Curated annotation (Swiss-Prot):
InterPro entries: Glycosyl_transferase_4, PNAcMuramoyl-5peptid_Trfase, PNAcMuramoyl-5peptid_Trfase_CS
Keywords annotated in UniProt: Cell cycle, Cell division, Cell inner membrane, Cell membrane, Cell shape, Cell wall biogenesis/degradation, Magnesium, Membrane, Metal-binding, Peptidoglycan synthesis, Transferase, Transmembrane, Transmembrane helix
Compartments (UniProt record): Cell inner membrane
Disulphide connectivity of cysteines: none
Species of origin: Leptospira biflexa serovar Patoc (strain Patoc 1 / ATCC 23582 / Paris)
Family, similarity comment: Belongs to the glycosyltransferase 4 family. MraY subfamily.
Principal place of residence: membrane
Name of this protein: Phospho-N-acetylmuramoyl-pentapeptide-transferase
Molecular function terms, GO-annotated: metal ion binding; phospho-N-acetylmuramoyl-pentapeptide-transferase activity; UDP-N-acetylmuramoyl-L-alanyl-D-glutamyl-meso-2,6-diaminopimelyl-D-alanyl-D-alanine:undecaprenyl-phosphate transferase activity
Pathway the protein contributes to: Cell wall biogenesis; peptidoglycan biosynthesis
Keyword Metal-binding: yes
Transmembrane region(s): 29-49, 70-90, 93-113, 133-153, 177-197, 209-229, 251-271, 273-293, 298-318, 349-369
Catalytic activity: UDP-N-acetyl-alpha-D-muramoyl-L-alanyl-gamma-D-glutamyl-meso-2,6-diaminopimeloyl-D-alanyl-D-alanine + di-trans,octa-cis-undecaprenyl phosphate = di-trans,octa-cis-undecaprenyl diphospho-N-acetyl-alpha-D-muramoyl-L-alanyl-D-glutamyl-meso-2,6-diaminopimeloyl-D-alanyl-D-alanine + UMP
Tagged with keyword Zinc: no
Lineage: Bacteria, Pseudomonadati, Spirochaetota, Spirochaetia, Leptospirales
Amino acid sequence: MFQWIYESFGNDYGFLRVFSYVTLRAMMAGLTSMFITFIFGKSLISFLLSLKFRESVRNDGPQSHANKSGTPTMGGLIMILSLTISTLLWGNLSNWNVILLLISAILFAGLGFTDDYMKSVKKIKGGMRARTKFIVTILFAVTITTLYFYYTGKSNVNLQKGIVFSITDLFLPFVKGPVWNLGIFAVPFAIIVLIGSSHAVNLTDGLDGLASGTVVISTATFALIAYVSGTPSAANYLHIPYLPGSHEYSVFLAGLSGALLGFLWFNCHPAQVFMGDTGSLFLGSTLGLVAIMLKKEILLVILGGIFVAEAVSVILQVGSFKLTGKRIFKMAPLHHHFELSGWSEEKVVIRFWIIGIILAIITLSTLKIQ
């Protein structure tokens, strides 16, 4: 909204020029969403409790989780609400990809809400049928990625070097320039990234503050990458693809980071509220979509190493048990394995945060080391 105000009245009122600066709008988006979450978070928790939106803890989980039963869930609602408001206020709504990011977040939050509602209110064990949930996820992913490739166009141009690259090109960390043009496989690949990221974050959401803390590290890192990718001089200096308009993603990502920090205030141990699938599905899908838009799909494996490890641990555990009848881990996802190995919940979470920060530093280093 403020960007539109500047574009409409900036020539008449010079002080409105301040709203043209992406850095200012990004900071304000982060503060706006964070304060919305702070101010209304406690009221939302009371509201969720009154509606009996409570978490049911699995019986075969760690014994230390028994006291979590009854904790309100669907806390992702406050994050998607604050993100939407901050984006509408501070985002550049003439940038189609910013709108697509917001639409994607709302769709996946809606899917997660439906699943949470069926589990906590309707008391349907497991929530939505796995097949139904997977089909809806695929439909959302196909729609979003198709819209992205259709409206973004056939190519982007690095204006500084005159390098033309296709949006179907694949880039690798530490390698300068595209390594392979995916062609017709670009959309299926993007769909896999989107779905995989969504479910990986969903699996990570099992301890107080684990998912919210690790995701905010990733969103903040992507916000920096988005800003330099959309700034010609910075992209030229770092020899990375210049993506016109991508610096506007940093406003959206700053808003999401603020929402996550505000939510973490209530979600840290002992958690007053859980994000539920309402939060985890939209957070994961957003990371995947941003990676696609920034041409950092493979880099997401490094930045989101925690999420990858959690997902791989589940795949290995299930595969091993089906093939050999034996389990590799004491329990999957991976964070439960460490809990059953004697680590306290707080220790697992903080150590995973530390690893996430290290991975973020490595991710940022790839921008220059190539």
